[in-house]
Amino acid sequence: MSSALDDRAVAAPPNPPADHHTRGARFLLLLAVFLCAACGLVYELALTALGSYLIGNSVLQTSVVISVMVFAMGVGSLAAKPLRHRPVVAFAVVEGVLALVGGLSVLMLYAAFAWLQLYMPAMIVVSLVVGLLIGAEIPLLMTLLQRIRTQEASSAVADMFAVDYIGALVGGLCFPLFLLPTFGQLKGALVVGVVNAVAGVIVVVFIFRRQTGRLVKAGLLAGVALVLAALGTTYVLADDLEVTARQHMYADPIIHSETTQYQDIVVTRSTAFTGEPDVRLFLNGDLQFSSVDEYRYHESLVHPALSGPHSNVLIMGGGDGLALREVLRHEGVRHVTLVELDPAMTRLARTFEPLRKLNQGSLDDPRAKVVNADAFTWLREARQQYDAVIIDFPDPDSASLAKLYSVEFYDLLRRVLAPDGQVMVQSGSPFFAPKTYWSIAKTIETAGYATTEFQIDVPSFGNWGFVLARPGTEAPPLRLARDTPKLRYLDAAVLKAATVFPVDRRRTDVRPSTLMDPAVLEYVQDEWRDY
């Protein structure tokens, strides 16, 4: 008896309207399923990507968003059970609300981050609401599918989930390959919200128009029209809203900003206390340099590494062209390869006058070759050997960056490093993040290098550290090459003093970082949490 009751519970309504038993109606409903699935996955990806840009720690952001949304989807499915008696109206309302909340989700979270400093609580609430609404879609769509044509529950489930998964595939690919490059995060979410609203219109207007009373249908269509108007108005104002919110996060006027598929790029300009212009580059909110004192950082990063042979040089990272500028000052340099992940960064360094002026057009120097590729992947395929390697990656505050500070990465690097070559690695701050700094040094040593650690002061950064390394057991001397041009900051005395670490910042007991155990990611997230 229990089995019979269960079978009846999942069976389709016994008397589905005959006028809806058409292939066209079924196709349109499955199209709505496809659109809903694609939109749902895009919302999920948009939330995880935004969190990674604004907060970092992509693993945590992804885990929280997915966990909260999957939990909420289960709750939403249960909450939709009482609504199956009026599935057309319920589905239209769910789609309208989901279109509004999902479409505005990126803007709402960006505003919460910029003005309220409440990103994580807001992200959890938005993920919960979006998940509840997505979860309510499936049981309602299942009921509607059975009303079109009665079929076994297993067959209906198979059809529904097949289309659902295909829609998720398309949405997952569409987000990084089309929506982000074409519209950006904020406008992309708004466009997807419009698609979500269209899915509701398909059901109400084209499939079940005869089952919906005139007043109800008019009310639903009016609601959808309001949602579309809200999304459309926000789309028109999106650029101004984004600029206002973004400017609130930076002390100085923004002169350029763009969001690429890899990162958020912002350039600001103000007047320093000396009266000279202060141009600053930020990636995902983290300061990369100030034009007032960047020479201190880049002289320290480049010139000690070129104290040995330096005819053929490799730079990894440094898409702004400033490290390349310093390398090209050496007369002995014949060829430089710069590997930078984001083509938007190197394009900006070439064409945006404030950056081009700083890097002195280095990316267009005939001795320089720019390669836009993932450094880890490029290194696995590289065969040419280099006399010196300059590594200028951002701090390893995400899993994708932590792999570039791993034992495996430095193992690969040895394959392209000449036997007498040297490597310089920017390694963060020994003062603010000592465990991170010494973990990077230990990781390099674990990969078979001898190291020399040193630190400098960069006013816009504070204390900053580097690691000079070469294969073998003999630590490389910290010195300048004979053909070193006249420098503004470095000389022999400064380098000698730079190797002295105070007692409270000397080497500590830390783990090396590997792909399977990214210790440096753990350290950097812990030490930079309060800054």
Swiss-Prot record:
Active site: 392
UniProt EC number: 2.5.1.16
Cross-referenced InterPro entries: MFS_trans_sf, PABS, SAM-dependent_MTases_sf, Spermi_synthase
SUPFAM superfamilies on file: MFS general substrate transporter, S-adenosyl-L-methionine-dependent methyltransferases
Pathway field: Amine and polyamine biosynthesis; spermidine biosynthesis; spermidine from putrescine: step 1/1
Keyword set, alphabetical order: Cell membrane, Membrane, Polyamine biosynthesis, Spermidine biosynthesis, Transferase, Transmembrane, Transmembrane helix
GO cellular component terms given for this protein: plasma membrane
Residues annotated as binding spermidine: 298, 320
Membrane topology listed for this record: Multi-pass membrane protein
A Gene Ontology molecular function term of the record: thermospermine synthase activity
Reactions it catalyzes: S-adenosyl 3-(methylsulfanyl)propylamine + putrescine = S-methyl-5'-thioadenosine + spermidine + H(+)
Subunit structure: Homodimer or homotetramer.
Main function: Catalyzes the irreversible transfer of a propylamine group from the amino donor S-adenosylmethioninamine (decarboxy-AdoMet) to putrescine (1,4-diaminobutane) to yield spermidine.
Name the UniProt record assigns to this protein: Polyamine aminopropyltransferase 1
Organism (species): Streptomyces coelicolor (strain ATCC BAA-471 / A3(2) / M145)
